[in-house]
């Protein structure tokens, strides 16, 4: 080893790469307003995918910089990396996005070293950022007081958030009525009533969102005002939302990531946490596009939970998967999914295809109907954190992925998703009204995914879950495809009477052929549920319905899927 080991130079190069990533990330994000104002819906989808892919692309570039600048015997001397970490800490201490720069450093370390060399001495398993920072600032917000009337307050808001509104006075009247409907009359007349909105606008898909809170001397309510651009009619304020559950859904793990310019991410996350206290900060960071840091915060929450509870891993409730094995911690609202070594004979996919399908979900518009995933490699857990039956099953079905190393269980590869109640189990215990609502939403989920060019493939009830807000969400991705890749067909009429009696089809079936007429018995064993779903969403059984959606997608149409209830529409 040379006398001078280049810890400072390596740390600086890693941070320079982070600055480059942040600049490109911000450039894509800042284009969101123009794309919204010009109604460039397909460009919005492309920009969202490009921003998601940017992180790994830039990590790869910086990995190349480091390998070009330093010999491997120097760069990969892992015993020296605590020096790099120390130098890096000094560099990021004055920054306003220091928590993100820790995650970036971790990504570079993991791109250079195998996971068995991970330690808190070399990287940031635990954050070094103080919970209260000397440079921490309050979020950038605008405040509006009830000086005259609710309409005057709303007009003041829209004067500051200036767009080419089509009929602002009509919007103001409608939003005032919604506000009076949502809040008690005495609140609407309270002279201390104040609106605080985050200064930057949030953009996602075909919408823009003003986000903040309403408060008086006693209480506070979240506040979201979605804006839509009606081509040829200008921008309109579509709704005024103060219900915490509805606002939580807007920031759901089933949604695409917002584009919002946040030079100090912790500011905005702390602001959101005040109005959505039920959201974990991992989910809030992820919701604004910092999904890698969301992953860091998730992992820290997981290891903290394991260290401070008696929780043990169990197999997740529900029908065992044919491709994936799923386990969970009862006290931690997450499932862990691993790929089995052998699939059921009816499955034609292979391991590489399953991985590609799950990675695809990260970059497509999930329209509130697909759970976001996080991919992990080389998780290590204490053996005594597994129930024996759970560990035995995992070792049996996935011995290449789950490895016992003394008192440690190594999970070589897995995905995490939010835990939900499987739809088939939910229906078993649901009331008549709950069955109706769940099947209505199940059909809507399929339709909205299809309109976003996603075909679930395996649409069985067990592959959908019900969230705590009662929404039906798809979560099993090994057979998903783009809708435009599927060949929807009507079943040809039988050639002879004997054809109908045969157990074999009398027509050829290609690898991408789907016959919607076959859905009813495939989806529903319960005849009552089958009849109800046919009444609610019978068009899903018609190949022409699916072909119509395909035609619209090929024409470049981008559908409206709203993450909130639209009042009076």
Curated annotation (Swiss-Prot):
<keyword id="KW-0963">Cytoplasm</keyword>
<dbReference type="GO" id="GO:0008772">
    <property type="term" value="F:[isocitrate dehydrogenase (NADP+)] kinase activity"/>
</dbReference>
<dbReference type="InterPro" id="IPR046855">
    <property type="entry name" value="AceK_kinase"/>
</dbReference>
<feature type="binding site">
    <location>
        <position position="337"/>
    </location>
    <ligand>
        <name>ATP</name>
    </ligand>
</feature>
<keyword id="KW-0723">Serine/threonine-protein kinase</keyword>
<dbReference type="GO" id="GO:0004721">
    <property type="term" value="F:phosphoprotein phosphatase activity"/>
</dbReference>
<dbReference type="GO" id="GO:0005737">
    <property type="term" value="C:cytoplasm"/>
</dbReference>
<dbReference type="InterPro" id="IPR046854">
    <property type="entry name" value="AceK_regulatory"/>
</dbReference>
<dbReference type="GO" id="GO:0006097">
    <property type="term" value="P:glyoxylate cycle"/>
</dbReference>
<feature type="binding site">
    <location>
        <begin position="316"/>
        <end position="322"/>
    </location>
    <ligand>
        <name>ATP</name>
    </ligand>
</feature>
<keyword id="KW-0816">Tricarboxylic acid cycle</keyword>
<dbReference type="GO" id="GO:0006099">
    <property type="term" value="P:tricarboxylic acid cycle"/>
</dbReference>
<keyword id="KW-0904">Protein phosphatase</keyword>
<protein>
    <recommendedName>
        <fullName>Isocitrate dehydrogenase kinase/phosphatase</fullName>
        <ecNumber>2.7.11.5</ecNumber>
        <ecNumber>3.1.3.-</ecNumber>
    </recommendedName>
</protein>
<dbReference type="Pfam" id="PF20423">
    <property type="entry name" value="AceK_regulatory"/>
</dbReference>
<keyword id="KW-0067">ATP-binding</keyword>
<keyword id="KW-0808">Transferase</keyword>
<comment type="similarity">
    <text>Belongs to the AceK family.</text>
</comment>
<comment type="function">
    <text>Bifunctional enzyme which can phosphorylate or dephosphorylate isocitrate dehydrogenase (IDH) on a specific serine residue. This is a regulatory mechanism which enables bacteria to bypass the Krebs cycle via the glyoxylate shunt in response to the source of carbon. When bacteria are grown on glucose, IDH is fully active and unphosphorylated, but when grown on acetate or ethanol, the activity of IDH declines drastically concomitant with its phosphorylation.</text>
</comment>
<dbReference type="GO" id="GO:0005524">
    <property type="term" value="F:ATP binding"/>
</dbReference>
<dbReference type="GO" id="GO:0006006">
    <property type="term" value="P:glucose metabolic process"/>
</dbReference>
<keyword id="KW-0329">Glyoxylate bypass</keyword>
<keyword id="KW-0547">Nucleotide-binding</keyword>
<keyword id="KW-0378">Hydrolase</keyword>
<keyword id="KW-0418">Kinase</keyword>
<dbReference type="Pfam" id="PF06315">
    <property type="entry name" value="AceK_kinase"/>
</dbReference>
<feature type="active site">
    <location>
        <position position="372"/>
    </location>
</feature>
<dbReference type="GO" id="GO:0016208">
    <property type="term" value="F:AMP binding"/>
</dbReference>
<dbReference type="GO" id="GO:0004674">
    <property type="term" value="F:protein serine/threonine kinase activity"/>
</dbReference>
<dbReference type="InterPro" id="IPR010452">
    <property type="entry name" value="Isocitrate_DH_AceK"/>
</dbReference>
């Amino acid at each position: 080893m040379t006398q001078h080991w280049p810890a400072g130079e390596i740390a600086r190069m890693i941070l320079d790469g982070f600055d480059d990533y942040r600049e490109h990330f911000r450039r894509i994000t800042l284009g969101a307003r123009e794309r919204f104002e010009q109604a460039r819906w397909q460009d919005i989808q492309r920009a969202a995918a490009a921003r998601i892919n940017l992180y790994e692309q830039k990590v790869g570039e910086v990995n190349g910089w480091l390998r070009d600048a330093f010999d491997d015997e120097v760069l990969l001397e892992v015993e020296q990396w605590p020096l790099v970490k120390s130098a890096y800490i000094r560099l990021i201490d004055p920054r306003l996005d220091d928590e993100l720069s820790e995650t970036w450093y971790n990504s570079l370390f993991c791109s250079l070293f195998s996971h068995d060399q991970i330690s808190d001495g070399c990287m940031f398993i635990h954050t070094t950022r103080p919970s209260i920072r000397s440079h921490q600032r309050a979020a950038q917000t605008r405040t509006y007081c009830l000086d005259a009337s609710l309409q005057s307050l709303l007009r003041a808001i829209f004067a500051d958030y200036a767009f080419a509104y089509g009929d602002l006075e009509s919007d103001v009247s409608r939003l005032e009525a919604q506000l009076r409907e949502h809040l008690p009359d005495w609140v609407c007349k309270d002279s201390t009533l104040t609106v605080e909105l985050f200064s930057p606008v949030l953009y996602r898909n075909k919408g823009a969102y003003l986000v903040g809170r309403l408060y008086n001397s006693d209480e506070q309510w979240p506040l979201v005002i979605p804006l839509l651009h009606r081509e040829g009619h200008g921008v309109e304020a579509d709704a005024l939302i103060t219900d915490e559950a509805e606002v939580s859904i807007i920031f759901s793990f089933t949604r695409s990531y917002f584009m919002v310019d946040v030079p100090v991410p912790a500011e905005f996350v702390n602001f959101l946490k005040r109005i959505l206290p039920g959201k974990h900060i991992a989910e809030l960071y992820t919701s604004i596009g910092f999904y890698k840091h969301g992953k860091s915060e998730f992992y820290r929450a997981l290891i903290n939970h394991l260290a401070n509870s008696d929780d043990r891993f169990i197999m997740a409730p529900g029908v065992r998967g044919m491709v994936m094995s799923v386990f969970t911690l009862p006290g931690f609202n997450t499932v862990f999914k691993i790929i089995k070594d052998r699939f059921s004979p009816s499955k034609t996919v292979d391991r590489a295809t399953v991985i590609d399908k799950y990675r695809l979900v990260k970059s497509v518009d999930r329209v509130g109907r697909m759970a976001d995933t996080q991919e992990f490699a080389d998780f290590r857990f204490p053996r005594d954190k597994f129930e024996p039956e759970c560990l035995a099953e995992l070792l049996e079905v996935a011995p290449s992925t789950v490895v016992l190393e003394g008192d440690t269980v190594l999970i070589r590869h897995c995905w995490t998703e939010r835990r939900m109640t499987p739809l088939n189990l939910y229906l078993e215990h649901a009331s008549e009204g709950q069955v109706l609502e769940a099947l209505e939403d199940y059909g809507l989920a399929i339709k909205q995914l299809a309109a976003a060019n996603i075909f679930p493939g395996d649409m069985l009830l067990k592959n959908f879950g019900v969230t705590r807000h009662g929404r039906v969400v798809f979560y099993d991705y090994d057979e998903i495809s783009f809708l435009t890749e599927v060949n929807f067909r009507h079943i040809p009429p039988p050639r002879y009477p004997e054809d109908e009696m045969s157990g074999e089809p009398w027509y050829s079936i290609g690898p991408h052929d789907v016959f919607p007429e076959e859905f009813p018995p495939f989806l529903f064993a319960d005849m009552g549920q089958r009849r109800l779903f046919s009444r609610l969403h019978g068009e899903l059984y018609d190949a022409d319905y699916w072909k119509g959606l395909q035609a619209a997608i090929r024409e470049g149409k981008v559908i409206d899927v709203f993450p909130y209830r639209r009042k009076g529409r």
